[in-house]
Amino acid sequence: MVVASPSRGFKTLADLVTVAKAKPGTLTFASAGVGSASHMAAERLRVAAAIDVRHIPFRGAEGLNEVMAGRVDFYCIPVAPAVPLINAAKVTVLAVSTRNRAALLPNVPTVAEAGYPDAEYLFWGGVAAPAKTPTTIVHKLHDVIEKALRLPAVREKLATLGVEERLLTVEQFDKFVSDDMAATLVLAKSAHLEPED
Protein backbone atom coordinates (compact mmCIF):
# COMPACT_ATOMS: atom_id res chain seq x y z
CA MET A 1 0.00 0.00 0.00
CA VAL A 2 1.04 3.59 -0.51
CA VAL A 3 1.30 5.68 2.66
CA ALA A 4 2.31 9.30 2.96
CA SER A 5 3.45 11.70 5.60
CA PRO A 6 0.37 13.37 7.15
CA SER A 7 2.25 16.68 7.03
CA ARG A 8 2.05 16.63 3.23
CA GLY A 9 -1.74 16.86 3.21
CA PHE A 10 -2.29 14.17 0.57
CA LYS A 11 -5.69 12.50 0.96
CA THR A 12 -5.64 10.40 -2.22
CA LEU A 13 -3.15 8.91 -4.62
CA ALA A 14 -4.34 11.48 -7.16
CA ASP A 15 -3.21 14.25 -4.77
CA LEU A 16 0.31 12.82 -4.65
CA VAL A 17 0.47 12.31 -8.43
CA THR A 18 -0.83 15.83 -9.09
CA VAL A 19 1.91 17.39 -6.95
CA ALA A 20 4.57 15.08 -8.43
CA LYS A 21 3.58 16.11 -11.96
CA ALA A 22 3.39 19.82 -11.06
CA LYS A 23 6.78 19.78 -9.34
CA PRO A 24 8.92 17.05 -10.98
CA GLY A 25 11.79 15.74 -8.88
CA THR A 26 10.67 17.38 -5.64
CA LEU A 27 8.74 14.55 -3.97
CA THR A 28 10.67 11.72 -2.34
CA PHE A 29 9.92 8.13 -1.49
CA ALA A 30 11.70 5.98 1.04
CA SER A 31 12.38 2.27 0.83
CA ALA A 32 13.89 -0.47 2.94
CA GLY A 33 16.84 -0.48 0.53
CA VAL A 34 17.68 -0.65 -3.15
CA GLY A 35 15.87 -3.58 -4.75
CA SER A 36 13.67 -4.21 -1.71
CA ALA A 37 9.95 -4.88 -2.12
CA SER A 38 9.15 -1.37 -0.87
CA HIS A 39 11.52 0.06 -3.49
CA MET A 40 10.10 -2.01 -6.35
CA ALA A 41 6.50 -1.22 -5.36
CA ALA A 42 7.26 2.51 -5.44
CA GLU A 43 9.09 2.15 -8.75
CA ARG A 44 6.06 0.38 -10.21
CA LEU A 45 3.93 3.37 -9.11
CA ARG A 46 6.49 5.84 -10.44
CA VAL A 47 6.54 4.17 -13.87
CA ALA A 48 2.75 3.61 -14.02
CA ALA A 49 1.93 7.21 -13.08
CA ALA A 50 4.82 8.64 -15.14
CA ILE A 51 6.00 10.77 -12.24
CA ASP A 52 9.47 12.06 -11.43
CA VAL A 53 10.06 11.31 -7.74
CA ARG A 54 13.36 10.74 -5.94
CA HIS A 55 14.25 7.48 -4.22
CA ILE A 56 15.84 7.67 -0.80
CA PRO A 57 16.95 4.16 0.24
CA PHE A 58 17.35 3.21 3.89
CA ARG A 59 18.26 0.00 5.64
CA GLY A 60 15.07 -1.57 6.95
CA ALA A 61 12.28 0.41 8.59
CA GLU A 62 14.24 3.65 9.02
CA GLY A 63 12.64 5.02 5.85
CA LEU A 64 9.16 4.59 7.28
CA ASN A 65 10.26 6.57 10.34
CA GLU A 66 11.38 9.38 8.02
CA VAL A 67 7.95 9.42 6.36
CA MET A 68 6.24 9.59 9.76
CA ALA A 69 8.55 12.47 10.71
CA GLY A 70 7.67 14.31 7.50
CA ARG A 71 11.19 14.34 6.06
CA VAL A 72 10.25 11.94 3.22
CA ASP A 73 6.96 12.10 1.32
CA PHE A 74 5.78 8.52 0.82
CA TYR A 75 6.51 4.82 1.27
CA CYS A 76 5.09 1.54 -0.08
CA ILE A 77 4.46 -1.01 2.65
CA PRO A 78 2.55 -4.26 3.23
CA VAL A 79 -0.84 -3.98 4.92
CA ALA A 80 0.01 -5.63 8.27
CA PRO A 81 2.67 -3.19 9.52
CA ALA A 82 0.77 -0.20 8.11
CA VAL A 83 -2.55 -0.69 9.90
CA PRO A 84 -1.41 0.39 13.40
CA LEU A 85 0.34 3.43 11.91
CA ILE A 86 -2.78 4.38 9.95
CA ASN A 87 -4.98 3.94 13.02
CA ALA A 88 -2.61 6.12 15.06
CA ALA A 89 -2.63 8.78 12.28
CA LYS A 90 1.16 8.49 11.93
CA VAL A 91 0.77 7.96 8.17
CA THR A 92 -2.00 8.65 5.66
CA VAL A 93 -2.98 5.73 3.47
CA LEU A 94 -3.52 6.69 -0.18
CA ALA A 95 -4.17 3.32 -1.85
CA VAL A 96 -3.53 -0.40 -1.56
CA SER A 97 -1.27 -1.85 -4.23
CA THR A 98 -3.04 -5.19 -4.52
CA ARG A 99 -5.64 -6.17 -7.12
CA ASN A 100 -8.42 -6.21 -4.50
CA ARG A 101 -9.11 -3.99 -1.52
CA ALA A 102 -7.55 -5.12 1.74
CA ALA A 103 -9.94 -6.85 4.14
CA LEU A 104 -8.53 -4.83 7.06
CA LEU A 105 -8.99 -1.54 5.17
CA PRO A 106 -12.09 -2.00 3.01
CA ASN A 107 -12.61 1.74 2.44
CA VAL A 108 -9.15 2.26 0.93
CA PRO A 109 -9.14 2.15 -2.89
CA THR A 110 -6.73 0.06 -4.91
CA VAL A 111 -4.13 1.68 -7.15
CA ALA A 112 -6.22 0.45 -10.10
CA GLU A 113 -9.31 2.20 -8.74
CA ALA A 114 -7.18 5.32 -8.36
CA GLY A 115 -6.39 5.13 -12.08
CA TYR A 116 -3.07 3.26 -12.09
CA PRO A 117 -3.69 -0.46 -12.72
CA ASP A 118 -0.06 -0.96 -13.77
CA ALA A 119 1.01 0.10 -10.27
CA GLU A 120 -0.32 -3.11 -8.71
CA TYR A 121 2.33 -4.76 -6.56
CA LEU A 122 1.90 -7.78 -4.34
CA PHE A 123 3.98 -8.00 -1.18
CA TRP A 124 4.20 -11.76 -0.78
CA GLY A 125 5.94 -14.39 1.27
CA GLY A 126 6.41 -18.09 0.78
CA VAL A 127 8.35 -21.08 2.00
CA ALA A 128 11.30 -22.38 -0.01
CA ALA A 129 13.76 -25.22 0.38
CA PRO A 130 17.35 -25.53 -0.89
CA ALA A 131 17.56 -26.22 -4.64
CA LYS A 132 18.74 -29.80 -4.33
CA THR A 133 16.09 -30.89 -1.81
CA PRO A 134 14.54 -34.19 -2.98
CA THR A 135 11.10 -33.77 -4.56
CA THR A 136 9.51 -36.16 -2.07
CA ILE A 137 10.70 -33.96 0.83
CA VAL A 138 9.49 -30.78 -0.92
CA HIS A 139 6.03 -32.31 -1.38
CA LYS A 140 5.93 -33.50 2.25
CA LEU A 141 6.81 -29.98 3.43
CA HIS A 142 4.14 -28.56 1.13
CA ASP A 143 1.50 -30.93 2.52
CA VAL A 144 2.34 -30.03 6.13
CA ILE A 145 2.26 -26.29 5.38
CA GLU A 146 -1.01 -26.63 3.47
CA LYS A 147 -2.60 -28.49 6.39
CA ALA A 148 -1.47 -25.75 8.76
CA LEU A 149 -2.87 -23.03 6.48
CA ARG A 150 -6.25 -24.78 6.50
CA LEU A 151 -6.51 -24.67 10.32
CA PRO A 152 -9.13 -22.11 11.41
CA ALA A 153 -6.84 -20.70 14.12
CA VAL A 154 -4.03 -20.12 11.61
CA ARG A 155 -6.40 -18.56 9.06
CA GLU A 156 -7.85 -16.25 11.73
CA LYS A 157 -4.40 -15.16 12.90
CA LEU A 158 -3.26 -14.46 9.34
CA ALA A 159 -6.44 -12.45 8.70
CA THR A 160 -5.83 -10.28 11.78
CA LEU A 161 -2.37 -9.54 10.36
CA GLY A 162 -3.78 -8.57 6.98
CA VAL A 163 -2.29 -11.63 5.31
CA GLU A 164 -4.44 -13.22 2.63
CA GLU A 165 -3.15 -16.74 2.11
CA ARG A 166 -3.01 -18.36 -1.30
CA LEU A 167 -2.62 -22.10 -1.41
CA LEU A 168 -0.52 -23.05 -4.42
CA THR A 169 0.86 -26.39 -5.50
CA VAL A 170 4.65 -26.74 -5.60
CA GLU A 171 4.53 -26.33 -9.37
CA GLN A 172 2.24 -23.29 -9.18
CA PHE A 173 4.55 -21.66 -6.63
CA ASP A 174 7.61 -22.34 -8.83
CA LYS A 175 5.81 -20.64 -11.73
CA PHE A 176 4.63 -17.77 -9.51
CA VAL A 177 8.21 -17.09 -8.34
CA SER A 178 9.59 -17.32 -11.89
CA ASP A 179 6.90 -14.99 -13.24
CA ASP A 180 7.45 -12.52 -10.38
CA MET A 181 11.21 -12.50 -10.98
CA ALA A 182 10.67 -11.89 -14.71
CA ALA A 183 8.23 -9.04 -13.99
CA THR A 184 10.70 -7.52 -11.53
CA LEU A 185 13.45 -7.60 -14.16
CA VAL A 186 11.16 -5.87 -16.67
CA LEU A 187 10.31 -3.25 -14.04
CA ALA A 188 13.97 -2.73 -13.17
CA LYS A 189 14.78 -2.13 -16.84
CA SER A 190 11.86 0.24 -17.41
CA ALA A 191 12.81 2.14 -14.24
CA HIS A 192 16.46 2.25 -15.41
CA LEU A 193 17.69 0.52 -12.25
CA GLU A 194 21.21 -0.86 -12.28
CA PRO A 195 22.52 -3.71 -10.11
CA GLU A 196 24.66 -2.66 -7.17
CA ASP A 197 27.56 -4.53 -5.59
Regions found by a protein language model. Give the residues of each.
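Hinge/capping helix and adjacent helix->loop/strand transition within the periplasmic-binding protein
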Residues: 1-62, 74, 111, 124-157
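Conserved functional loop/turn residues at catalytic and ligand-binding sites
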Residues: 12, 70-71, 78, 90, ...
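Short helices/loops that flank or line small-molecule/ion binding pockets
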Residues: 20, 44-48, 62-75, 80-88, ...
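N-terminal (or domain-start) structured segment
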Residues: 26, 34, 50-73, 85, ...
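Paired acidic/hydrophobic, glycine-rich loop segments that form the ligand-binding mouth/hinge
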Residues: 28, 73-77, 92-95, 184-186
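An extracytoplasmic/periplasmic, membrane-proximal ligand-sensing/linker region
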Residues: 48-51, 135-197
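Short beta-strand and adjacent tight-turn residues that come in two discontinuous sequence segments
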Residues: 58, 76-78, 96, 121, ...
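C-terminal lobe and pocket-closing loops
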Residues: 82-150
